[in-house]
Amino acid sequence: MTDLKKAAQRAIELMDLTTLNDDDTDQKVIDLCHKAVTPAGNTAAICIYPRFIPIARKTLDELGAEDIQIATVTNFPHGNDDIAIAVLETRAAVAYGADEVDVVFPYRALMEGNETVGYELVKACKEACGEVLLKVIIESGVLADPALIRRASELSIDAGADFIKTSTGKVPVNATLEAAEIMLTVISEKNTKVGFKPAGGVRDAAQAAEFLGVAERILGADWVSPRTFRFGASSLLNSLLHTLELADAPKPTQGY
């Protein structure tokens, strides 16, 4: 197997296959569940809006794919600074049956100099999650400033995040190697049990390999696993399957 094929295989096993569109329906989520069961093995998770969790759970059970985790989003996509609403949404997501919650950090508040609300929001949402995994989306493409990307990562980890995630996929700049370098360095300094999720903008096996390479350089090859590394993506899967010669070439897409 070539290095590119190895990267494609790993990326599928590390993928949160995502649909977070305004026109999502039960049928689109059912289709997503079927796609997550690939000829190259199952993706790590699917990521969907909370209201679709019950139909996703039913579908994955019917497919015998109980190992695929169900992730959802809260305080999404704008990262508002209302802690009470973020906590209510997170509690509701857990009640729906989410295995993982991706919450948006109040990044605009941080840009305005308020560090406290981000820390408190993540801390409160982690408490609401209990044993459910909490990923914190810092929206690195909007923060832009390396110092702000670093600070959002530090605050999230200090507040109890299980993962830090680059992006919502709803802004012009999503996952970048520069942001990955900063975020993974913070993980190496603070707590190597915390995971990292680049989301949006990873289009093919070559790009996936670049992100994996940064993680391995900073934290070691043994660190990378579904417990510590995920790709958030919608259009990436078809490209990876094509690399593995298990699907036709993907059509151009604007997908996440």
UniProtKB/Swiss-Prot annotation:
Cross-referenced Gene3D superfamilies: Aldolase class I
A matching Pfam family: DeoC
SMART domains linked to this entry: DeoC
Keyword Cytoplasm (UniProt): yes
Superkingdom, natural source: Bacteria
Parts forming coiled coils: none
Biochemical pathway: Carbohydrate degradation; 2-deoxy-D-ribose 1-phosphate degradation; D-glyceraldehyde 3-phosphate and acetaldehyde from 2-deoxy-alpha-D-ribose 1-phosphate: step 2/2
Places the protein is found: Cytoplasm
GO terms, biological process: 2-deoxyribose 1-phosphate catabolic process; carbohydrate catabolic process; deoxyribonucleotide catabolic process
EC primary class: lyase
InterPro entries found in the cross-reference section: Aldolase_TIM (IPR013785), DeoC (IPR011343), DeoC/FbaB/LacD_aldolase (IPR002915), DeoC_typeII (IPR023649)
Any one Gene Ontology cellular component term annotated for this protein: cytoplasm
GO MF annotations in UniProt: deoxyribose-phosphate aldolase activity
Family in the record: Belongs to the DeoC/FbaB aldolase family. DeoC type 2 subfamily.
Protein purpose: Catalyzes a reversible aldol reaction between acetaldehyde and D-glyceraldehyde 3-phosphate to generate 2-deoxy-D-ribose 5-phosphate.
NCBIfam families per UniProt: deoC
Protein name (database record): Deoxyribose-phosphate aldolase
Lineage summary: Bacteria, Pseudomonadati, Pseudomonadota, Gammaproteobacteria, Alteromonadales
